[in-house]
Amino acid sequence: MSASGFQKAFEGYLYENNTDGSGKASSYLKSIEWLHAMLDIESYGFSDCKDVWSINDVSRLSALRKRVLEEKRKQSESPWVHPNIPVSYLRDGYCTSALADLIEFIPEFEHVQRVMEAHAQHTNSSELAEKLNFEPTIPDGYVHDPQSKDGQNRICEAKIRIGQAAFRKMILSNYQNRCCITGLDITTLNRASHIIGWSDPKGKKIRMDPSNGLCLSATYDAAFDQHLISVDPDNRLLISKEIQNHYSNESVTNYFKNREGQAI
């Protein structure tokens, strides 16, 4: 993938995960632009990183992040504190945080690409599930001390997060980014729900099976997770007795009761 394509993919990742509306995504993207300018002033041996988007080596980016932290600690003594560069991007940690997110993004991006390539080549669900029954690769440099307990925990958490991100991408693609109950197509509001849960031992072999997933908008995903709704073997919506017997207001009727038996 080209550097511009990689940049666009990272932008999408940031905005997709910027759910609190804080403006973090745009600040991180801007901080990388200013980091390029800082490296133009003094590269410290990182001249290859003057275009960060051309670097997909996690170890190299981790080394760059370490240098940024060192310059941050120097405060006004750093040559990167320059009249033409807003000081807040270095001083307040935006550059280091942006690089941390980029380091997290790279193995997820690479794993999702592998999953989607396999998804495009296989139409048989069980065959695809077997093909995708592999763990994400966590590259060197992703954690500071991979042999420590904390490092091992971070790697384990990363593998789960990356696997779920790939599953989400595949399920939303299968459903054309539309909630299978309402047709809602606002991607940031839709979830990839596991029919058999990710942590359920019975579902270990089918975690990545496309037939084990539904695209549901947030309300229905929460209801599904709480067993308030389910699906029968013919993929028709079932409403729990708890909803049927204990809730009677108009919203519940419209959202749930009137959809009983709907094919999804």
Protein language model regions, located:
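Ser/Thr/Pro-rich, acidic low-complexity intrinsically disordered regulatory segments
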Residues: 1-8
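Calponin-homology-like cytoskeleton-binding modules
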Residues: 8-18
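Non-catalytic DNA-binding core/recognition domains of DNA-processing enzymes
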Residues: 16-108
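A boundary/linker detector
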Residues: 90-165, 184-189, 254-264
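A detector for short metal-coordination/catalytic motifs
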Residues: 156, 162, 166, 174, ...
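C-type cytochrome heme c attachment motif
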Residues: 177-181
